[in-house]
């Protein structure tokens, strides 16, 4: 049996996902799967065959349980005393796009290929986005 190599150029589609009322982890895993190309029949682990995904209404994402009160995001600057923490609800107010980006990119490979996959993710607060020229398909049941 021989190894399958897809052609160099991959036809990439654009999808738009509405995060309104969606659960954070379930939406993130679905989007990560599309970005990595695992929904594509020509999927190859060492070639980026994923599609572009635009997520809108990031501020309307929901989470279950007590995570709204207990979940914290940490960032370390590398200096003594440089550990910063932010609660979920404060980050949802301040930068809801960052919550989705962090969740989705955490589900992608930690390599050059993973960075390329993460570069095809666009997250926006509100229903408007600047990618109308790409004619994205609405992704149902994301």
Curated annotation (Swiss-Prot):
Protein name per Swiss-Prot or TrEMBL: Large ribosomal subunit protein uL13
SUPFAM superfamilies found in the cross-reference section: Ribosomal protein L13
Keywords for the protein's UniProt record, in alphabetical order: Ribonucleoprotein, Ribosomal protein
Entry's Gene Ontology BP terms: negative regulation of translation; translation
Subunit record text: Part of the 50S ribosomal subunit.
CDD domains: Ribosomal_L13
Protein family according to the UniProt entry: Belongs to the universal ribosomal protein uL13 family.
GO molecular function: mRNA binding; structural constituent of ribosome
Function: This protein is one of the early assembly proteins of the 50S ribosomal subunit, although it is not seen to bind rRNA by itself. It is important during the early stages of 50S assembly.
Family annotation (HAMAP family): Ribosomal_uL13
Lineage: Bacteria, Pseudomonadati, Acidobacteriota, Terriglobia, Terriglobales
GO CC annotation terms, alphabetical: cytosolic large ribosomal subunit
PANTHER family xref list: LARGE RIBOSOMAL SUBUNIT PROTEIN UL13M (PTHR11545:SF2), RIBOSOMAL PROTEIN L13 (PTHR11545)
Family annotation (NCBIfam families): rplM_bact
Cross-referenced InterPro entries: Ribosomal_uL13, Ribosomal_uL13_bac-type, Ribosomal_uL13_CS, Ribosomal_uL13_sf
Tree of life domain: Bacteria
């Amino acid at each position: 049996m021989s190894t399958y190599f897809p052609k160099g150029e991959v036809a990439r589609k654009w999808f738009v996902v509405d995060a309104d009322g969606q659960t954070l982890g379930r939406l993130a895993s679905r989007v990560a799967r599309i970005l990595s190309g695992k929904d594509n029949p020509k999927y190859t682990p060492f070639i980026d065959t994923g599609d572009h995904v635009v997520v809108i209404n990031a501020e309307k994402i929901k989470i279950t349980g007590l995570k709204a009160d207990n979940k914290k995001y940490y960032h370390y600057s590398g200096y003594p005393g440089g550990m910063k923490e932010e609660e979920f609800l404060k980050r949802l107010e301040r930068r809801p796009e960052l919550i989705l980006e962090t969740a989705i990119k955490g589900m992608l490979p930690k390599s050059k290929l993973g960075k390329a996959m993460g570069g095809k993710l666009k997250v926006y607060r509100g229903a408007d986005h600047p990618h109308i020229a790409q004619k994205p398909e609405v992704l149902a049941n994301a």
